[in-house]
């Protein structure tokens, strides 16, 4: 059995988990998240802990028990604490400005690049070269950060572009004559 799937998910105070036939929904201060129930995994709630059991001994069911456990854990952490990704803009004249649920980027193109934030996601720019994306859904936060980074990824010679705050970009040496 999956080692991840064996460990239960503890439910903190202020988080409500409901398990229906086809859906698991988690409700908390950060909002409501839901996940489609997998037929290969049986989810049960015992005294504030969620346990995940594969319905049979197949390899696929064992793998799915770990996957479903981690997805539900991400939902519980998301509605209680939330997730955030930080991006940094490096380059002369590179700027970001957040207004409401829109993000405007001036990153060296002849036109500004605009992003519309999905529901449940907030974006902030503490400085013009920093972007902070926050939300309850880990997948959406990471996907949005990756899409913003993909507009102008860091180039290998000077390191200019958009990178994650904790990302290390290796700088190549220029060609010598």
From Swiss-Prot:
Keyword rRNA-binding: yes
UniProt-listed InterPro entries: Ribosomal_uL6-like, Ribosomal_uL6-like_a/b-dom_sf, Ribosomal_uL6_a/b-dom, Ribosomal_uL6_bac-type, Ribosomal_uL6_CS
Database matches in Gene3D superfamilies: Ribosomal protein L6, alpha-beta domain
Subunit structure and binding partners: Part of the 50S ribosomal subunit.
Function (record text): This protein binds to the 23S rRNA, and is important in its secondary structure. It is located near the subunit interface in the base of the L7/L12 stalk, and near the tRNA binding site of the peptidyltransferase center.
Species of the source: Acidovorax ebreus (strain TPSY) (Diaphorobacter sp. (strain TPSY))
Pfam families for the chain: Ribosomal_L6
GO molecular function, one term: rRNA binding
Domain of life: Bacteria
Name used for this protein in its record: Large ribosomal subunit protein uL6
GO CC annotation: cytosolic large ribosomal subunit
Any coiled-coil regions, as ranges: none
Annotated GO biological process: cytoplasmic translation
KW Transcription (keyword) present: no
Similarity section: Belongs to the universal ribosomal protein uL6 family.
